[in-house]
């Protein structure tokens, strides 16, 4: 017997990230964030490797990162618009969770599955934040993939990389719905083919099930 959770299905059918420009103060308290983190880290994790770790970025830290981003962009001669956009992400944030993928040596669990698990944490944190009543979004930006910047600013090791930064604030307005995938274009149905052999082991026919 199946047990249908209509409320959960409705949430998943209508969920969407909140654009940063629609969010304002306040951000979740530490106790409120712990609830989100507990829910957000319940993700597929083959081998129980926990190939990720989290850093909570509170406002003073985000301001410090914004300064580091500005300095770094200027050091590599970025255009002003590129620098401004990179800095703004951190300046505007009130509370962020840095999700760091941590590759673990494993003979059974390939690296790509560990990457998927870290990505699952990002989505799960967004969903947990939304379910808790907060505005949440998953932002990364090119700086988060710049090895020099993340090593110096976030203290990442050589086996680590940024999966995403999840921001939480208060929602001011519900965003308009956007186009969603057309299932008819992306889904194919494959049925099992049952082969029937004759006495000489040649295929006599197959039955589509």
Tell where the protein language model's regions lie, with residue ranges.
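Short, charged/polar surface micro-motifs in flexible loops or helix N-caps
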Residues: 60-64, 70-71, 103-105, 148, ...
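N-terminal amphipathic, basic helical "cap/leader" segment at the start of enzyme domains
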Residues: 1-92, 198-209
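Phosphate/diphosphate-binding glycine-rich loops and adjacent basic-rich segments that engage nucleotide
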Residues: 176-209
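Small-aliphatic-rich amphipathic alpha-helix that forms the alpha element of a beta-alpha
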Residues: 40, 97, 103-150
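Short, surface-exposed loop/helix-turn segments at secondary-structure junctions
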Residues: 69-76, 108-112, 152-154
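A glycine-rich helix N-cap at a beta->alpha junction
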Residues: 87-89, 152-179
């Amino acid at each position: 017997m199946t047990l249908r959770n209509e409320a959960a299905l409705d949430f998943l059918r209508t969920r969407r990230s909140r654009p940063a420009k629609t969010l304002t103060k306040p951000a979740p308290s530490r106790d409120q964030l712990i609830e989100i983190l507990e829910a957000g880290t319940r993700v597929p994790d083959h081998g129980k490797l926990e190939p990720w770790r989290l850093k909570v970025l509170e406002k003073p830290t985000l301001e410090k990162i914004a300064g580091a981003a500005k300095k770094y962009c200027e050091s590599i001669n970025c255009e002003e618009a590129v620098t401004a956009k990179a800095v703004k992400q951190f300046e505007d944030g009130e509370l962020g969770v840095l999700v760091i993928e941590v590759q673990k040596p494993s003979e059974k669990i390939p690296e790509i599955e560990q990457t998927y698990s870290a990505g699952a944490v990002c989505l799960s944190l967004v969903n947990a934040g939304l379910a808790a009543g907060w505005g949440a979004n998953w932002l990364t930006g090119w700086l988060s993939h710049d090895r020099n910047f993340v090593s110096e600013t976030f203290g990442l090791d050589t086996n680590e990389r940024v999966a995403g930064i999840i921001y939480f604030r208060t929602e001011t307005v519900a965003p308009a719905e956007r186009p969603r995938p057309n299932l008819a274009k992306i889904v194919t149905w494959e049925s099992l083919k049952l082969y029937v052999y004759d006495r000489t082991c040649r295929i006599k026919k197959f039955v589509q099930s």
